[in-house]
Amino acid sequence: GRGAHHRAHPAFAMFAGLPGAQGLDAPALQAWLGVGGGQMLWDDLGAQFGFKPLVAGHTGPSAGLWAGARLETAAEFSGSRIQVAGIAADVVRALGAVPVDNIDPSDLRAAFADGRVHAAELLGPLAVVTSGIEPLAQRLYAPGINGNGMLLSLQVRKPLWDRMSTADQAIFEACAAEEYRLSLAEAQAHALIAAQVAGPAKWPVRLAFSGEVASALAAAARDVVEQIAATDPAARRIHDSYQAFRGLMGQARIA
């Protein structure tokens, strides 16, 4: 689902991670927060709701969208029950799908079997291994919808944060940053473990989204992000900063 902070203010989604090409990958997101002005904008937004936000982890990139049936056309999304995180729920809803709240990986195989879910994007490589969904979700559409993965945050109550010394605040920030670094290392290691466990299995069949579906998802993602930006002036400032940094990253990759 969207999470409590998104419900408090839609612009919090900009810090958690955006779907498709609208989003920054984990290193770029950290760069925007650390030196691109993102943390100051996040601090301002968090202060309105009484907390100081810190980066404290990341899921790593998504393996893709696991599906038990074909999702080759936009029409095939219609009525499909799809588990996705964050504002990707609004993206699949735009294609006529029914977003499903996060199901525990241990229950996901049963959810596929009884029709509670038809497709799921699992963030974290070991979630796939522990869920055992491969025989039921035989198609893996990569890179998925939240291809860049999602940031995990730590919120410190603002009165507590303001009472801390500068040194204590620096310790908190350093520990949170180290957790972020370790989480990315874990995600990379877990992806290798997951690949080894999977071995030369028949399933899943790895597929790219069709041009029709990719275009529909991209258009929906742009619309959803623009709706967030239109919430209020604070959301517009966050959006413009994020997208300007995304543009710089794109130019750097081309160069």
Predicted regions and their residues:
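N-terminal secretory/targeting leader peptides
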Residues: G1-A28, D44-A255
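Soluble or luminal CAZymes and related metallo-dependent hydrolases
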Residues: L33-G37, A187-H190
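Hinge/lid segment of periplasmic solute-binding proteins
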Residues: G34-Q48
